[in-house]
From Swiss-Prot:
Native source species: Ovis aries (Sheep)
Signal peptide: 1-25
Keywords in alphabetical order: Cytokine, Disulfide bond, Glycoprotein, Growth factor, Secreted, Signal
Gene3D superfamilies associated with the record: Cystine-knot cytokines (2.10.90.10)
GO CC terms in record: extracellular space
Top-level taxonomy: Eukaryota, Metazoa, Chordata, Craniata, Vertebrata
Protein name, entry field: Bone morphogenetic protein 15
Amino acid sequence: MVLLSILRILLWGLVLFMEHRVQMTQVGQPSIAHLPEAPTLPLIQELLEEAPGKQQRKPRVLGHPLRYMLELYQRSADASGHPRENRTIGATMVRLVRPLASVARPLRGSWHIQTLDFPLRPNRVAYQLVRATVVYRHQLHLTHSHLSCHVEPWVQKSPTNHFPSSGRGSSKPSLLPKTWTEMDIMEHVGQKLWNHKGRRVLRLRFVCQQPRGSEVLEFWWHGTSSLDTVFLLLYFNDTQSVQKTKPLPKGLKEFTEKDPSLLLRRARQAGSIASEVPGPSREHDGPESNQCSLHPFQVSFQQLGWDHWIIAPHLYTPNYCKGVCPRVLHYGLNSPNHAIIQNLVSELVDQNVPQPSCVPYKYVPISILLIEANGSILYKEYEGMIAQSCTCR
């Protein structure tokens, strides 16, 4: 409970900070985020940027779009949110965009056309668009008839303007029932819209036709909704998920390449010598149960107040590291050379230098399915969300 209370305080403090930053920007004062060399806020900010807001409730998203994304999530992650190794999604983020509005009108008797507008969010440098598809129902079954439908790009004063035949269909495993079609429109989105600045809207036409010989129905799409029959899928990859490690200084690199374990052995030898040096007792290492180790911890998104926009998973197991770092850092802790030297300095030179702390060493990602403020549904893999092992550094 204490950890949960502390986490809540930190989260609300971050929210207040972000609101203050927005207010400062609105009155013309520079925010901290725009100052040079300002450190980026942690991952929690990225999560909060996707949230609808404290006062907004979860947008009502039902029907096939939600079912599609839930199935995509279940195929890509397990019940705890861990990404599956055999996932075939081909991206670290998928956004389902529903049309903002539609203009429907009967045309040429048996033809029925809807014009659909899909808003495209501003580009983010960290994410690269790798695929774009439109999903629609190619068969609409009504009370007294049925319609055959297709999607085409909207072009002013053009009765028909089909997508290139090479763009039809999808090479990925389909999550769709037989009455639905997924069509690749990456070329159209990439060339026409994606690199444009300012407000961008993808406009498509949903065209349906009644079978020949059937009674012409004069209706305005009663009983059907384009919000549930057509949606856009945008696939992204995180370009910053794999960060290159900085090279070691030339001297240290040559030293470690000759004998990588030499520095570690010397540090251990110095540690054993330090035990014979007169000084304050270092018996605070304590019993083995107090040694630095990984501790399980689980919290629900409902406890964090995020369940109004996070669909899955329901529980989050971040884990945490706790315990005393030993006086001699053994190999299993994976401590960096700096921590080993710092430990020696604390033992032999200056006891005011703090000993290394017990912190997470390795993390694993978590997949989250959430609803954005505009009603879009987002699947996203967040790196560094679950601590898997600990180290002293």
